[in-house]
Amino acid sequence: MEVKVGIGDYAVAKKTGIISTYGLGSCVGITLYDRLNRVGGLLHALLPESARYGGRGNPAKYVDTGLELLIKDMMKLGASPRRLEAKLFGGAHMFTNVSNENLMVGKKNVEVAKRELKKRGIRLVAEDTGGKGGRTIYLDVSTGKVRMRKVSNGKVIEAVF
């Protein structure tokens, strides 16, 4: 069974299934996985920090508060925060004519994701971030592997992390 995660959303599962998200541009997709209990989760975050944007609306649309929700729901399924491994995708620079640091949301999303993972003691084991193209990712909850598809310079690239 495949669960599709939209922008500003997340999903968790135990032992089986695929959790996917499409269209990661400047957004980031963060997968977390507990190998021992085979609990996985995926967050598709739109913006870096809730406080920076007034904390309005859905907390899952922000990297910092969305990650907190993801971890809590994974713990309900038996995951241990000490065993979580993270993989990070997205954070593309979608608007090449923008050079203002404050408007480079993709770069900031990646920075905040790494900071929040480190703050929680979660090891980042793989990433594919930056660039100018979108990505689609699929987390296989039975193995923890993430399959990624992206378009770069007109070519479709697939990789497994």
UniProtKB/Swiss-Prot annotation:
GO terms for biological process: chemotaxis. One of its GO terms (molecular function) is protein-glutamine glutaminase activity. Gene3D superfamilies: 3.30.1330.200. InterPro entries: CheD-like_sf (IPR038592), Chemorcpt_Glu_NH3ase_CheD (IPR005659), Cytotoxic_necrot_fac-like_cat (IPR011324). Coiled coil: none annotated. It is an enzyme of class 3 (hydrolase). Its EC number is 3.5.1.44. Pfam families: CheD. The keyword Hydrolase applies. It catalyses: L-glutaminyl-[protein] + H2O = L-glutamyl-[protein] + NH4(+). Keywords: Chemotaxis, Hydrolase. Belongs to the CheD family. Probably deamidates glutamine residues to glutamate on methyl-accepting chemotaxis receptors (MCPs), playing an important role in chemotaxis. This is Probable chemoreceptor glutamine deamidase CheD. It comes from Thermococcus kodakarensis (strain ATCC BAA-918 / JCM 12380 / KOD1). The lineage of its organism: Archaea, Methanobacteriati, Methanobacteriota, Thermococci, Thermococcales.
